[in-house]
Amino acid sequence: MSPWEAKWIRHSEVRPFPQPEPITVEEKVAVMLKPEIHVKNGCHPYPAVNDLGETNSGLKTKGAPSGMCKGSGWGSQVYGRHALFKGVWAIMYSWYFPKDMPSTDFGHRHDWEHVIVWIEKPVVENVKILAVTPSAHDGYSKQVPPNPGHLNGLAAKINYESKWPINHALEPTGLGGEKQDLILWEQLSSNARHALNIVHWGDANTPFNDYVFMGKLEKAFPL
């Protein structure tokens, strides 16, 4: 497949990237702070793209909100990207969902949601979490500093939920959730990065690609 061609494959056929062994301090910190996601309703996270750059075709808004999307047999994925922003370190963690469906015929194919964890600096010991900002309907909720009850150690606990008839969003929670294999932007294959930069996901958009990542940090900046 040419890297310049977009190719969609069935939502259940996309294989995630295995989580690489972290080498740099930034990679180690990103793994340490990997959040937990609790799915209250709707789809569970799925891989969005494979190493060839083939992308998840998603699902129509038919059947039950969690119909055909209660988890991939190949395993799931959380995508990460980090940057120094206005003097602090930001790590964005993002999940893809095949559909965003409050109820039958509501919502849309594809959903991207993300949470940004803000820390003083990337250090392996004594990491200081300054804020947690989950995405919600083109905006963010902001916890500065995070509620200790919304953390499991260093992992932010995040709830994914649709409050009918509104589409899904993320929010902090006291409920435990699941973690997925983390793949950072620079660890993705070039084909996967290219696909995430150019593929149009309808009413959803990839929040960590080259075109929108810094704008998301600007919008979410909590300090």
Curated annotation (Swiss-Prot):
Keywords: Host cytoplasm, Secreted, Virulence. This is NLP effector protein 2. It comes from the Eukaryota. The keyword Secreted applies. InterPro entries: NPP1 (IPR008701). Belongs to the Necrosis inducing protein (NPP1) family. The lineage of its organism: Eukaryota, Sar, Stramenopiles, Oomycota, Peronosporales. GO terms for cellular component: extracellular region; host cell cytoplasm. Signal peptide: none annotated. It comes from Plasmopara viticola (Downy mildew of grapevine). The keyword Secreted applies. Probable secreted effector that may act as a pathogen-associated molecular pattern (PAMP) recognized by the plant immune system. Seems not to induce necrosis, neither in several susceptible or resistant Vitis species nor in the dicot model plant Nicotiana benthamiana. A motif (Conserved p motif) lies at residues 107-113. Pfam families: NPP1. The structure of NLP effectors is remarkably conserved with a high level of conservation of a central region containing the conserved undecapeptide motif AIMYAWYFPKD and heptapeptide motif GHRHDWE.
